[in-house]
């Protein structure tokens, strides 16, 4: 910086960025501490504001395929604020990959999250609800893309008060070995289904202000949101 404060420390080894890359705010306090290997960030690392408090939002690039995702801190949790779009072998499909992400069966949902993140448990979802308070569905749903409510001109869009942006991507109701032309995609615009580690799904509804936990066939496809370990 112009005031002489160190801005960044980047370790190199054999021509590659290798090790912990540190960036600093102009006041000298640590901004980020990110692990790198062969020029790629390989884990989430540490993110801090100039006053030393934890950063509440940012972007993280999946080291496996280079796709960048926005992340958000809600309460004491850090969530990836977009549906995962990691293209695992045969157990994931998508209708609008760039909008809704991919729909995963349970087996592939378990490997969908990038390094440093994991598939959330039912308790993780319940903790999220506790952090945002009553009418959690409305507060966490995206402000667009949800169907109109029956008999009204109003849409089931959320307020997205926390930047979580749950999108109504629906689900995939068929096993992975069923021909694509015979698979059933349903509930787009009406519901969002997100896997839990227990094999249930957290469901957001276009016509309800709450989020529910429901049973789901492990061979069928639901969206994935990831939480920091």
Region locations from a protein language model:
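Conserved positions within compact, well-structured domain cores
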Residues: 53-229
């Amino acid at each position: 910086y112009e005031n002489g404060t160190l801005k960044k420390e980047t370790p190199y080894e054999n021509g590659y960025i290798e090790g912990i890359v540190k960036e600093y705010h102009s006041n000298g306090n640590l901004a980020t501490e990110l692990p790198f290997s062969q020029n790629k960030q390989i884990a989430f690392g540490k993110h801090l504001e100039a006053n030393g408090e934890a950063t509440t939002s940012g972007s993280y690039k999946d080291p496996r395929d280079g796709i960048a995702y926005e992340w958000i801190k809600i309460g004491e949790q850090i969530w990836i604020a977009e549906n995962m779009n990691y293209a695992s072998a045969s157990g994931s499909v998508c209708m609008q990959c760039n909008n809704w992400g991919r729909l995963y069966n349970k087996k592939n949902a378990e490997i969908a999250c990038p390094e440093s993140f994991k598939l959330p448990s039912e308790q993780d979802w319940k903790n999220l609800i506790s952090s945002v308070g009553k009418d959690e569905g409305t507060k966490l749903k995206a402000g667009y893309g949800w169907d109109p409510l029956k008999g009204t001109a109003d849409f089931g869009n959320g307020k997205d008060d926390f930047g979580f942006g749950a999108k109504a991507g629906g689900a995939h109701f068929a096993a992975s070995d069923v021909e694509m032309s015979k698979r059933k995609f349903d509930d787009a615009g009406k519901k969002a289904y997100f896997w839990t580690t227990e094999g249930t799904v957290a469901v957001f509804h276009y016509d309800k202000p709450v989020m529910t936990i429901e049973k789901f066939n492990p061979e069928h496809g639901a969206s994935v949101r990831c939480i920091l370990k």
